[in-house]
Amino acid sequence: VNLKENYFKGGVKTRSSKDRIVPIHSAIRPFVYKRLKKYGCLLGRVATLREDMYISLEAIGIPKHTPHDCRHTFSRLCEKFKVEDNDRKRMLGHSFGSDITNRIYGHRTLEDLRVEIEKIKICD
């Protein structure tokens, strides 16, 4: 997490997900800062995160979901709020496959991605 420039950097599974940059949406920035200050890290072990998520969801009466479901939600919100499809793929760490134009020549800045992610409207 880069707090100075407000973005996440990560991904370890595939070439396209490694070192990907995802801006921190302004609506979640306070939660990110608070969690980092309290715990010193954003997320701990996946198993612990999953178990904590299950307990929290059950406590507020929401059916069980996995952490991976958050990726589906993010992707759906990108579609709903007209985030550029190529930028949605970049932020999710998806490959451009045979799309040579975007794979080789598609360069986007942090600010470009920030403009796109801020299209997602979050209720207060």
Where are these regions (language model features)?
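Short, polar N-cap/turn motifs at the start of nucleic acid-interacting alpha helices
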Residues: 1-2, 64, 83-104
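DNA-binding alpha-helical recognition surfaces that contact promoter or target DNA
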Residues: 51, 77, 90, 107
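Histidine-centered active-site/metal-ligand motif
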Residues: 25, 68, 72, 94, ...
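Exposed loop/turn and edge beta-strand positions of beta-sandwich/beta-sheet ligand-binding modules
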Residues: 4, 18, 61-64, 69
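Conserved tyrosine-mediated DNA breakage-rejoining catalytic core shared by Y-recombinases
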Residues: 1-31
